[in-house]
Curated annotation (Swiss-Prot):
Membrane-crossing residue ranges in chain numbering: 19-39, 74-94, 109-129, 131-151
Keywords noted in UniProt: Cell membrane, Membrane, Transmembrane, Transmembrane helix
Family membership noted in the UniProt record: Belongs to the UPF0421 family.
Protein name: UPF0421 protein BT9727_2513
UniProt lineage: Bacteria, Bacillati, Bacillota, Bacilli, Bacillales
Amino acid sequence: MNQVRKWNIIGGRVIKTGIAVFLTVLVCEFFNIPTIFAVITAIVTIEPTATDSIKKGLVRFPASTIGSAYAMTFTFFLGHQALSYALAAMFTIVTCQKLRLHAGTLVATLTAVAMIPITADHYFTAFLIRLATTSTGIIVSTVVNFFILPPHYVKTISGCTEELFVKTANVMEEWLTALMDGKVIKKETTYNLSKLTVLLHKAVQFVQYEQKDWKYHRHTKKEMRSFLLVQKQLHLLQQIIYHIDNLARAPIETCDWSQNEKEILRRTIHSIISILRNHCEKIDEEHFKLIDELDKQFWTNKNDLAHCKPNQYHHHFSSESIILFEVLSIHDMLEELKQIFEKYEGENQEKSILVDIK
């Protein structure tokens, strides 16, 4: 997987940007209008989703209109002076921010300052031409983003989800090593946990991208089920990572386990690691027995704390109780993941049977 990523230099968005620029130049040359502003607009209008291209395009057009108007106004009154550049940029930024045209502020400002040195007269004509070039760049880029290599993130999301299962298991294994040694977790484990969170946020962002364009493209029922599966998996993995983060912050060095308690906890976490690496497709009976033992430990610890007097103990949970609670919570998420997978597999089997009957 890493090797494929390493050599995947040119992605779909880069290709679409090149196509959009090429077509924009052709259109501008056909109508004999300047290309540079249209090309700038075309480049920035290519977004991760077609929906964003349309929405931000509708923002960038009025923003560029504002920038062009300020540029021509200050050039008319002040000429090609440094003050013209400064005032055009400042007024464009302030106006765009006040009108909440945030997505178009950069393009509008670039348009404003770039128009000044190339306009000597016929200011109103130059203003209209700039509207035409901006419109050309926005329209061409939006059409390209919509019809050419339309964004599909389902495979990317699935890849991220598989990676999350593996890396979550690896972090759990690193934490278990620290627990068994009775030491604070290593900096490397903390770093891996932060990378895990970044990967999760990246996957969630891809889900949001896919949802935005969902209404614009056709999908088979199988693709829809697959997308819903990974969406639910990511939601539960997010909760698992949250509980692992709590485990990483738990005071391991203050724990006082008996040998039997420590062994049951070790075996349970090993079982959780194995289930995660298997994408929660199967949970055996031995795992449920270990969870029952762990559950008994948790309630025993909690009941023991109930007899403590306030001046002897100032916390509602001991270190052991916190760890047991987080591990049991992770198990609950694993059960939900297994149920989701079984439901998905069952629907696929029903579909296959219906196809065979037909």
